[in-house]
Amino acid sequence: MEQELTFRIILEKPPAGVDFGLQQGRGSNYEVVQKQRSKTGDLHFEFTARVKNGKDGPTLLGPFVQGPPNERFVYLGIGTFAGQTDTPWSRRLKIPLRGITWDVIKQASAQVLETRVRGTGKDGSPTCGTIKPFAGWKVKPL
């Protein structure tokens, strides 16, 4: 049985003047959607993924989902990876899709799974790479 889940990423206070976007597709065959230029506040990205019964629990599928079944994630493109030409930044932010159990899926059926990610690194540049530590996904109202 497949079910569709809605996800929301809140990128908290990224550096101003940088483009961010959600990567749809894989490898070199992708496009950036929901492109946003940071100003002073948070950026919000939403996407859906299908979930089906996998060998070791839920398996997420869809055009935004990347990686092997047990290590799924989504990418946010930063700077040139989001299509911005007037920037020194050329990065991606890897947001894990882990910790999503059948119990969480049941709770989230008519709601959204939300995570909050720090948008600025310790050096003042856009956060990039794999999110560590990752706070996980929380069930929130739509």
Model-based region annotation:
Residues 10, 50, 94-96:
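Generic structural detector for well-ordered beta-strands
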Residues 5-11:
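A short, amphipathic beta-strand motif
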Residues 27-81:
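Tryptophan-paired
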Residues 8, 21-32, 139-141:
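Short loop/turn and low-complexity linker motifs enriched in small/turn-promoting residues
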Residues 19-22, 59-61:
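Beta-strand acidic-aromatic groove motif in beta-rich domains, primarily in extracellular
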Residues 12-17:
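Short proline/glycine-enriched turn/loop motifs at strand-loop junctions of beta-rich domains
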Residues 1-3:
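Extracellular ectodomain segments of secreted/surface proteins
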Residues 81-142:
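Extracellular beta-sheet/turn segments enriched in Thr/Pro/Gly and aliphatic residues
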